[in-house]
Amino acid sequence: LRPLLLKARENGVLVNFDMEQFALKDLTLELFMRCCEEIDFQAGIAMQAYLRSGDEDAARIIEWSKRTGRQVTVRLVKGAYWDYETIHAEEMGWPVPVWSRKCDSDACFERMARAFIHSTPRTQDEGGVKLALGSHNARSIGAAIAELEKVGLPKAALELQMLYGMAPELKQAASE
């Protein structure tokens, strides 16, 4: 990864670490943090709110970013592998790592978004998380915008990431 990250730094390119299977989550988080500590590049990581560990994972990234003075982007998503994670865990006799009800995933998403918003860096030299919401859920987007206003951050402190062609009316309303 070093050559890629050094080239990204040289060209001012953000490298986003994606989050896939639960089994690789801790390895992905650790690799992300170690790479960020070794090389100063524009860094981002996807984090999944459908994981029961979502709140702890958010706290881990926030604490690390503050302690190291590192600014990183978190692309907060609900998660896309619910069926796989559920079936795989049940087949192996393991606890299921994802929330079983959508309302629990939604609640975790909103808690994580609040935590990341509260850790938004206020200066260039301060560590913290810049939040990018990967969601088409109007309630979750509205809750994040309301939290921004509550803590006195401008709307520009939040990036909304939506799939092209999905929910164009919501996209328009959220951008206003």
Question: What is the predicted role of each segment?
Answer:
Residues 1-176:
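Positively charged, amphipathic and often flexible ligand-engagement surfaces
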